[in-house]
Swiss-Prot record:
Keywords: ATP synthesis, CF(0), Chloroplast, Hydrogen ion transport, Ion transport, Membrane, Plastid, Thylakoid, Transmembrane, Transmembrane helix, Transport
GO molecular function, one term: proton-transporting ATP synthase activity, rotational mechanism
Family in the record: Belongs to the ATPase B chain family.
TM regions (residue ranges): 27-49
Protein name per the record: ATP synthase subunit b, chloroplastic
Origin superkingdom: Eukaryota
Species in which this protein is naturally found: Barbarea verna
One GO cellular component, as annotated: chloroplast thylakoid membrane
Heme found in the keyword field: no
Main location: plastid
Quaternary organization: F-type ATPases have 2 components, F(1) - the catalytic core - and F(0) - the membrane proton channel. F(1) has five subunits: alpha(3), beta(3), gamma(1), delta(1), epsilon(1). F(0) has four main subunits: a(1), b(1), b'(1) and c(10-14). The alpha and beta chains form an alternating ring which encloses part of the gamma chain. F(1) is attached to F(0) by a central stalk formed by the gamma and epsilon chains, while a peripheral stalk is formed by the delta, b and b' chains.
Length: 184
């Protein structure tokens, strides 16, 4: 039993210069395997992510176009309000004697309400853009994480064979037996 354990211990200590052998130190090989898996995922997943980002970009651009159309509608409303204001000013000249202060108050209310409407539309456009950007970023993060996790699981499943698993268990049992004999 001790010879079997020693043979596994010596497998892990083969000289690295000029030779090729099995690396049985699983903790040392996992970062290398993970870096290879991530490299492959990034290399092959780049096209998928670019397509996803292009789709999101188109949605954001469509949202911006819609917001611009709303803005143009607000500008049209502002022009209508200005035309109405000119009409009110004309009527104000006619009724100046009867109620100059009332007309001025209506004019200010009209300008303020139009300004508030325009500001609300601008805020809505900005909030929509921020929301779409954040949603796109979150979806891309989730998809990348899922693809990386699936790739890592697939790599781990393909690397572990039944025989290697049993040999590792037997070697560890042998080491624990040796440690128990030493402590007794």
């Amino acid at each position: 039993m001790k010879n079997l354990t020693d043979s596994f211990v010596y497998l892990g200590h083969w000289p690295s210069a000029g030779s090729f052998g099995f690396n049985t130190d699983i903790l040392a090989t996992n970062p290398i395997n993970l870096s290879v898996v991530f490299g492959v995922l990034i290399f092959f997943g780049k096209g998928v992510l670019n397509d996803l980002l292009d789709n999101r970009k188109q949605r954001i651009l469509n949202t911006i176009r819609n917001s611009e159309e709303l803005r143009e509608g607000a500008i049209q409303q502002l022009e209508n309000a200005r035309a109405r204001l000119r009409k009110v000013e004309t009527e104000a000249d006619q009724f100046r004697v009867n109620g100059y202060s009332e007309i001025e108050r209506e004019k200010l209310n009209l300008i303020n309400s139009t300004y508030k409407t325009l500001k609300q539309l601008e805020n809505y456009k900005n909030e929509t853009i921020l929301f779409e950007q954040q949603r796109t970023i979150n979806q891309v993060r989730e998809r990348v994480f899922q693809q990386a996790l699936q790739g890592a699981i697939g790599t781990l499943n393909s690397c572990l064979s039944h025989e290697l698993h049993l040999r590792t268990i037997n070697a560890n049992i042998g080491m624990f037996g040796t440690m128990k004999e030493i402590t007794d």
